[in-house]
Structure formats: structure tokens, C-alpha cells
A protein has these predicted regions:
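Hydrophobic h-region of N-terminal signal peptides that target proteins for export
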Residues: 11-20
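Bacterial N-terminal signal peptides that target proteins for export
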Residues: 1-8
Length: 435
């Protein structure tokens, strides 16, 4: 803003005739390798079954226990994730990865004090997992919310609607920060926490709690400050006590065709609601995150196609899709991919035989600076059961998330892919509805 093709079935070692007093066989290396391979392929449920078998055979297997916690976190099954990660910490108290992921469990529950406490003993300035995947776990920022409820909702009714100021090149909306005048934000699920332009944040006097290196299009990096705001007003609702990121955004205003871009609404805000980006109607809909809201939505008119998703890192929504005639693969849902419907890793472009149109290359801007953008066309792209043909794609350099999460990501689906639909994000059951 890892790609194995084969699946090895492993037979259970313990047969029904095992003697009660017999020592439990230890998991074989082939079982462990098979589970790891399934995880790398993105087959999380299948991998989880094998890791569970391994833990039954050896309850002290740290790696399998940690992976069960990781898979539960990907699936947003937070109680299960907490159980397995706490077991992993008990097995290896000095290993930081389980503590970092446990902190993310509490972060997703908006229990910022427990999230900060979970990072006790972790070298937060150098921990690779925290820096690369969970940068929002800033201890000073989290601790600043003591005595407050993060993302506290103030407003009446079961939903609020906010018209897009414009839909192209990305949806843009008017919001208020800290009760001030209306300002212009764009919507981008490729982003995590609400983001503010650096200068706008200075004008507001936003407190700062340090900086991280953000990763953006083309593998570029830029410094991102971390802070907090008192409130964000979206439609008729006001959300109080929000962590925010800060980076230069006003430089993007011309590309959006607006006077001034002051911020971004990303996935973390969406996560707190049953959220719809309704492209055909040109509006953002936030509904309370309740069972009743979901049931009411499901009963509303219109055919809905549900696509299961997982959430890696602090905001990477991924789901199964296909590119050309290649086998099914995981794709990242990045509605902030501008001017294209898909962006693929270079390895996938080559494997699919996709031709880059170098004669149509242009210069563009990303969160990390200027980029050379080369277009291409993908004849067939699917996401879940939604299939589209002749989808515009773009290449702007390395795809830094291809192997970052321990499983293979082929690329991302973006604005042009989703704009025919109303896209609803259900984080309670981890699915996206397209209608």
C-alpha cells in the first residue's frame, strides 16, 4: 500500500488392536514433513489434522503445537489459538514466536493490555516475526489504551451507510477525525490499521509511539509512524480509541482526482463490523458484528457467493482462486490494488505463460515511492466460485508476500476484479460474500 503440487496421505500408525499398556509410537519424520508440506500449500485443515495426530503421539512436540496455534490464528479461532499457543509457550518458554502470535490473539480481541503483556521477554526491536508480520503490536501504543476500550462504538441503529465520494480509481469517502471537519480517506484492504497522512497527523497533534518499516508495492519500503486517535466518525457512527499508522499520503491526491487525501480505511476497521463495500451502489455499509446482523444480511435479496478466507499477519485476507489453467492457489484480497484486477508473483506470471506488455509500461506511485508499472492480461482468474475473463493485471516489481507467511501466495485480486460486486466481509465465520 512454496509451492508443492502433491499431497501425501499418511496412514494412522496406531491400529484399533493396539494394546492399552503399549508405549505410544512417536511421530515419524514423514508425518511431520507431510504436515509441513500441506501447510506450505495452504491446505490448513488437512495440515491441522496431521499436526493433531502428531501431538496425540507426542504431547511435547513444540513445532506441531505451535503450528496448531498458527492455523487456529489464521482461521480466527481465537480460543483454540490461545490454547495451543499457551501450550507451546509452556513447552519452550524462551521461544518468542508463540508469544508474538498470542499477543496477536489478544490484539484481535481488542485486549491491548494482555497483548502487550504477552510480549514480555520478547526482543520487540529485533524479533523477525513481529517486525515482518505483526508490526501493529507496538507495546507503547498498546499500553497507552489502558483503561479505555479500543474501537468503542457510539451510535444508534444496527448499521450505518456512507456514500463513496467517488469509486474510481479506488473508493473514496468523507470521514471526521477527533470530531474535526470532514476529510477524505480512500478504502484499501491491503492496509491494516486506519492510516493518516503524516502532515495531517501533525496538524491534529497525534501522539507518536515509534516507527516501523512498511512494505509496499514492488517490495519497496518506507517508514511508517505509529500512534492513536480519539475518534473516527464514519456515517452516523463514531468509533473511539483507535490505533493509527502515519505515512505520506497527500502526495497521492492527484492520482485520486481529489483535493486532498488525508487517510486510509483498512482491514482492521472492517474487522470490527460486518462490512460491505458496495461498488454498484457506491457506498460503504458498516453493520454491528453480531449473529443477528449476519442472519439479517443473509436473508436480504440477491444471490450471494461465499468464499472462505483466512487472515495472515494482522490483515492479509487470503482465499482460494485460480490463475489461467494452473492448479488452485491462495490469493490475497487487496481492494487497494489500483488500475488492475490482479497482481501476480513473477514466478506465477512465468509459470502461466503470461506476457508482459513492456511497450505499455508507465510510471506510478505506491506507498514506498515511484514504480515502473507494466500491464498484462490474464485470460482466466477465479476467486472462490467467481470467475472473470480477460482481467487486467500489473507488474511493478517483486511480490514481497509470496512466501512471507510460510505458505505460497500467488498474488492478489484487486479493485477491477471486485468492482462489479457488493463485497461483504464476515470475520466471525471467515468468509467473503460477493453479490
Amino acid at each position: 500500500m512454496k509451492f508443492a503440487r502433491t499431497c501425501i496421505a499418511v496412514a494412522a500408525i496406531i491400529g484399533p488392536g493396539s494394546f492399552a499398556g503399549q508405549a505410544t509410537p512417536q511421530p515419524s519424520q514423514s508425518e511431520i514433513d507431510s504436515a509441513d508440506r500441506l501447510f506450505q500449500m495452504g491446505k490448513f485443515a488437512e495440515a491441522g489434522k496431521l499436526y493433531s495426530q502428531i501431538v496425540i503421539q507426542n504431547s511435547k512436540d513444540y513445532s506441531a503445537t505451535l503450528q496448531l496455534g498458527r492455523i487456529a490464528l489464521l482461521s480466527n479461532r481465537l480460543d483454540d489459538a490461545q490454547k495451543w499457543l499457551e501450550k507451546a509457550i509452556a513447552l519452550k518458554p524462551d521461544d518468542a514466536d508463540a508469544k508474538v502470535m498470542l499477543a496477536e490473539v489478544f490484539y484481535r480481541r481488542d485486549d491491548f493490555q494482555k497483548a502487550a503483556a504477552s510480549l514480555n521477554g520478547v526482543e520487540v526491536s529485533s524479533n523477525k516475526l513481529l517486525i515482518s508480520q505483526y508490526p501493529s503490536l507496538n507495546v507503547a501504543n498498546l499500553e497507552s489504551f489502558k483503561g479505555q476500550t479500543p474501537y468503542e462504538l457510539h451510535g444508534n441503529g444496527t448499521s450505518t451507510r456512507l456514500k463513496f465520494v467517488k469509486t474510481e480509481p479506488l473508493p473514496v469517502v468523507s470521514v471526521r477525525v477527533n470530531g474535526g471537519d470532514e476529510v477524505t480517506f480512500f478504502i484499501d484492504t491491503g492496509g491494516s490499521e486506519v492510516a493518516l497522512d503524516t502532515e495531517f497527523a501533525k496538524e491534529l497533534g497525534v501522539p507518536q509511539f515509534g516507527a516501523i518499516q512498511g512494505t509496499f508495492s514492488g517490495g519497496q519500503h518506507a517508514e511508517v509512524q505509529q500512534g492513536r486517535i480519539e475518534s473516527l466518525t464514519v456515517g452516523d457512527w463514531t468509533i473511539k480509541n483507535l490505533p493509527v499508522a502515519m505515512l505520506p499520503l497527500r502526495q497521492l491526491s492527484k492520482g485520486f482526482g481529489v483535493k486532498q487525501i488525508d487517510g486510509i480505511i483498512g482491514t482492521t476497521l472492517f474487522y470490527h463490523f460486518l462490512t460491505t463495500m458496495d461498488y454498484p451502489r457506491g457506498e460503504l455499509v458498516l453493520r454491528r458484528k453480531t449473529v443477528e446482523s449476519l442472519e439479517q444480511f443473509k436473508k436480504s435479496p440477491g444471490k450471494k457467493v461465499a468464499v472462505p478466507i483466512w487472515m495472515a499477519s494482522d490483515h492479509f485476507m487470503v482465499g482460494w482462486g485460480r490463475v489461467e489453467t494452473l492448479p488452485p492457489t491462495l490469493l490475497f484480497v487487496d481492494t487497494g490494488l489500483m488500475g488492475a484486477g490482479v497482481k501476480l508473483a513473477e514466478s506465477v506470471i512465468k509459470e502461466a505463460g503470461i506476457k508482459l506488455e513492456e511497450n505499455k509500461a508507465s510510471e506510478g506511485a505506491g506507498g514506498g515511492g515511484k514504480l515502473k508499472i507494466v500491464p498484462y492480461t490474464v485470460h482466466h482468474v477465479s476467486f472462490g466460485d467467481i470467475k472473470e475473463e480477460n482481467v487486467p493485471g500489473l507488474y511493478d516489481g517483486p511480490f514481497p508476500w509470496e512466501n512471507m507467511f510460510g505458505f505460497h501466495l500467488a498474488g492478489m485480486v484487486g479493485h477491477d476484479f471486485f468492482k462489479p460486486y457488493a463485497v461483504t466481509f464476515d470475520f466471525q465465520n471467515m468468509q467473503i460474500f460477493l453479490q
